[in-house]
Swiss-Prot record:
Keywords linked to the UniProt accession: Carbohydrate metabolism, Fucose metabolism, Glycoprotein, Glycosyltransferase, Membrane, Signal-anchor, Transferase, Transmembrane, Transmembrane helix
Pfam family name, one: O-FucT
Protein name per its UniProtKB record: O-fucosyltransferase 6
Protein's organism: Arabidopsis thaliana (Mouse-ear cress)
Biased composition (Basic and acidic residues): 501-512
Protein encoded by which gene: OFUT6
Amino acid sequence: MAFQRRRNNYYNRLRRLLPFICAVSGALLILFALLSILSPPPDDSDRRISKHINYGANDEKKNTPVVFTVPRGGGRSDRDIWRSWNAEFFYGCCNASSKFPNAKAITRNDRYLAIATSGGLNQQRTGIVDAVVAARILNATLVIPKLDQKSYWKDASDFSNIFDVDWFMSFLSKDVKIIEKLPQKGGQTWSPRRMRVPRKCNEKCYINRVLPVLQKRHAVQLNKFDYRLSNKLRDDLQKLRCRVNYHALKFTDPILEMGNELVRRMRKRSKHFIALHLRFEPDMLAFSGCYYGGGEKEKKELGTIRRRWKTLHVNNPEKQRRQGRCPLTPEEVGLMLRALGYGSDVHIYVASGEVYGGEKSLAPLKALFPHFYSKDTIATKMELKPFSSYSSRMAALDFLVCDESDVFVTNNNGNMARILAGRRRYFGHKPTIRPNAKKLYKLFMSKENTTWEEFASRVRTFQKGFMGEPKEVRAGKGEFHENPAACICEDTDAKVKAGKMDSRKFGKKEQKEDEDAELSSSETDYEEDQTDLQDRGLYNGTRLDYDDALSVSEEPELEEMLSD
């Protein structure tokens, strides 16, 4: 009986507390609901366009709630923003030495090498350059390379539609014998033995793998020929690479004339101009696995594109960005340039495909640099008609304008960026800016909590070693097409006369630096960045190696789409 009374008392107390518990719970639910409504979503703001930034506002607008005010002018700079430091003391040098025999003396009449290139215009260019060297290694006659007409780009152009064939053959006549097509055998066109060599195949590799087949079959075609030659070759072969890339490969007259006209129109608008290879296309962003704060719409759009590539695993977007693997947004590129000293009066030529987000993404960049052009805005549709149906010819026009620009800015390290970087080093070290994305990441994320002066100072510090200046990268480091150190000489006599001789001792003009010299911090940053790209298999703009047959069959478009 006593037990029953105690149990009744317990339930009575519980019933009296129940309304109070319900009231407290209800109040908490209402509080949480209010907080969820009033609080912004965590880290889901659109990074393509920053809030609370005033682009070039006057100091009078003191009531505007702006934390980060970007000046209209570039400010005072401690450097000439239109030329590289000490560039006048370096020059391209790729003449053959007296020990490099003439092609007639070493070419075997029963050896023919053909190649089939791969990818977009600039990836194919690397294949053409290396094919000449491969033919020289094998003492073979080179057949004019076949351009890729079946990949993602679906460009029906052949070699003669892009490059001047006669000039190519005549300029290299002392180095390699070149013919337009294989000779006939028994009244029929010679059918070559098709094969493929590994990536980065060196001289010994070609002798061991290709030469025995060539000696037996006399005609060999190397397929998917891109980056199939080692970065490290003896100097006379490296100089041959440079003769091909910087002198023998000349665009056809129609391309040159239109490209030069585009440059003339840019020069008519301004004495100096910047060319920007933006690379903010949907395909590029989808492949990178990066996220720019566009919410579910962005995730769905880029996710749909990304699913085309079955071999890509799911990335951590924040980790990708921290490690410098994400292209800068158009706004971030603009802020970097302003911090480096380029004011709103600077004219910019943009080489880009479809920009993700369209005008919304481009708006901050255009606000920073209103003098904003592309080939479509400075040329008529009628003028571009002979080129517009061919992706390689359109890319060639952009290539020419970017090459002739006073400053070239690249937002990724694809083939076009690397080839132009090497070419601009060879022809006078014209400024070539590549964002140090790994270091800039945190700075961009916290920019609205700092002053412009502090932001600009840190950008300038982080970009040391990424500006295309002489000796920025140690000889032999990185991709040869980007850093053709064997083909760049130093005029030490002129440097001594100018009173700018380095404290280190220099020997002859072509003497290499001591390999054990201590790296500067900026060079270390650069080399870490290149090593990271190589480790991820992205050094030539892709995760896939064509040596993997399974990858080829599953991902036929991946490399071509992202290569340039």
